[in-house]
């Protein structure tokens, strides 16, 4: 089950039942608590980073990409997540400009702010690809 409230993943423990926090910022702690991973809209662009954090946890390595993963998520959280995702991805493929109400694309000022924040993190669609 997806836990967007962040109330379950720390407390609910049922055999053969997976809790998936709904934010990249909860991935590492969730894994430490026995969660199977995350389920989040922004994972469409953070999958590579999320996978690296997951793999490092499984392999008992230092989570070298967790801060960047959380920083990217935080950049998107400053706006409506779906609007931010579609606005970000629309530079690569115009199909992402198609959204249904009540969702809309970010206004130009907010889109520039989001892109600038992601650029400061050296995060691009190219860098987000799962290898």
Question: What are the language-model segments listed below?
Answer:
Residues 1, 30, 85, 114:
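Conserved, mostly hydrophobic/aromatic
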Residues 2-79:
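Catalytic alpha/beta core domains of metabolic enzymes, predominantly
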Residues 31-32, 68-104:
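Conserved short secondary-structure transition element at the edge of the structured enzyme core
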Residues 94-128:
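Flexible C-terminal active-site loop/helix
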